[in-house]
């Protein structure tokens, strides 16, 4: 992957289980289950699927005694599967009671998510917040203080509205709401530090559901603290709308060096895999050049020269195959996540894109000779034809991974250079 020089916002370094967040650590991908946590088997299975898809931290709901009682079992089930992904407990309303009554839950989690807006009101709320912070200190756990637009601390908001009404130059209501989110997060972090929690165990988030509001809030929050920030557009929505909205907001902030963990909060389509939010988060980071997770396939959009759907089917097959193989490949073949593959539909851009990729195939368009040249490291390697092109090209990709990224392939990677012949344009 081409290097991208984006100056990251300086932050503290926080450890969440074995995962480092903030400072010079890579931007981390997070996800969340939608299972009933009281169903230990079902929750562990979904956590495992999310981790296999590439989620580096997984959040689970801890909302009842039944759920809290199964957290340790979920952790054990994952350990038995060889899955060490850190678990984050998502607490609302009754987190103090659940952590007190189920100490195994407190120990099994790597991080506690606390929402200042619903931990409790007044002195009672302060006591509940303090108990959760002290529990995190006792077990050396990280804490994310996560403020949400939809559950903002109403007492804080009322206090700020009163002060704003008395101000000589009052803020417009939308700006006041943004400021209330930021103040809630910063004041809660200050309270946690006063109680005794190390600043190096704190992550902040201020989530809203509007793209421009999210950008404004995080720009301001990022300039007023050195805590790592978790990015996410809450209630982003379903399908393409959710993907576009999340990407539009997060890409702007990431380009400015703001953000240390991200989650794409998609509403799944009926029957859709929960892992899609992980794939979208990875692809966002990878297309921005911030990280590499899996080889990505370059494919043309199609036009009148590509009336067949064959190249689309092959591109989809190859992308799916690469994702399926990555849990094994990332362990066996370091560097394979940077591999570039091209599946092109006709002679116009097909050969050129295929030469620019590590490995590429240029399929015949409408009216072209029914052959498909394959290019490896910029050079034409073989020409495929017939009904077995998908299987043959898949085998070529598989062999390329083994020879280039396997044992003995490191030297080849170091010395490999790509020469792309440029033909002069005829007058």
Swiss-Prot record:
SUPFAM superfamilies: Nitrite and sulphite reductase 4Fe-4S domain-like. The keyword 4Fe-4S applies. Binds 1 [4Fe-4S] cluster. Pathway: Isoprenoid biosynthesis; isopentenyl diphosphate biosynthesis via DXP pathway; isopentenyl diphosphate from 1-deoxy-D-xylulose 5-phosphate: step 5/6. Its cofactor is [4Fe-4S] cluster. Belongs to the IspG family. Converts 2C-methyl-D-erythritol 2,4-cyclodiphosphate (ME-2,4cPP) into 1-hydroxy-2-methyl-2-(E)-butenyl 4-diphosphate. HAMAP family: IspG. This is 4-hydroxy-3-methylbut-2-en-1-yl diphosphate synthase (flavodoxin). It comes from Chromobacterium violaceum (strain ATCC 12472 / DSM 30191 / JCM 1249 / CCUG 213 / NBRC 12614 / NCIMB 9131 / NCTC 9757 / MK).
């Amino acid at each position: 992957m081409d290097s991208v020089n984006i100056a990251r916002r300086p932050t503290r370094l926080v450890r969440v289980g074995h995962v480092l967040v903030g400072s010079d650590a890579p931007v981390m991908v997070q996800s969340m289950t939608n299972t009933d946590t009281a169903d230990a088997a079902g929750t562990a299975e979904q956590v495992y699927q999310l981790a296999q898809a590439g989620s580096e931290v997984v959040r689970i709901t801890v909302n009842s005694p039944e759920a809290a009682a199964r957290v340790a079992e979920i952790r054990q089930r994952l350990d038995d599967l060889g899955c060490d992904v850190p678990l984050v407990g998502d607490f609302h309303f009754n987190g103090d009671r659940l952590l007190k009554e189920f100490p195994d839950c407190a120990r099994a989690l790597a991080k506690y998510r606390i929402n200042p807006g619903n931990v409790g009101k007044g002195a009672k709320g302060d006591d509940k917040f303090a108990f959760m912070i002290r529990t995190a200190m006792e077990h050396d756990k990280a804490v994310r203080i996560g403020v949400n637009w939809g559950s903002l601390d109403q007492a804080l908001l009322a206090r700020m509205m009163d002060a704003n009404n008395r101000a000589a130059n009052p803020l417009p209501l939308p700006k006041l709401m943004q400021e209330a989110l930021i103040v809630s997060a910063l004041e809660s972090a200050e309270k946690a530090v006063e109680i005794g929690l190390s600043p190096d165990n704190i992550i902040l988030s201020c989530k809203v559901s509007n793209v421009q509001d999210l950008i404004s809030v995080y720009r301001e929050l990022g300039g007023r603290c050195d805590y790592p920030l978790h990015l996410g557009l809450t209630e982003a929505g379903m399908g393409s709308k959710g993907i576009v909205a999340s990407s539009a907001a997060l890409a702007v902030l990431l380009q400015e060096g703001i953000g240390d963990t991200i989650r794409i909060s998609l509403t799944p389509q009926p029957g859709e895999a929960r892992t899609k939010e992980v794939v979208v988060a990875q692809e966002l980071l990878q297309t921005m050049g911030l990280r590499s997770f899996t080889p990505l396939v370059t494919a043309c959009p199609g036009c009148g020269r590509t009336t067949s759907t064959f190249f689309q089917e092959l591109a989809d097959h190859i992308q799916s195959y690469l994702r399926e193989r990555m849990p094994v490949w990332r362990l066996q073949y370091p560097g394979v996540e940077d591999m570039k593959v091209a599946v092109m539909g006709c002679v116009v851009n097909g050969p050129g894109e295929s030469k620019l990729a590590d490995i590429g195939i240029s399929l015949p368009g409408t009216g072209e000779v029914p052959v498909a040249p394959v290019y490896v490291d910029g050079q034409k390697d073989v020409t495929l034809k017939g009904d077995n092109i998908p299987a043959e090209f898949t085998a070529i990709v598989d062999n390329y991974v083994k020879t280039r990224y396997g044992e003995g392939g490191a030297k080849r990677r170091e010395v490999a250079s790509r020469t792309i012949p440029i033909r002069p344009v005829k007058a």
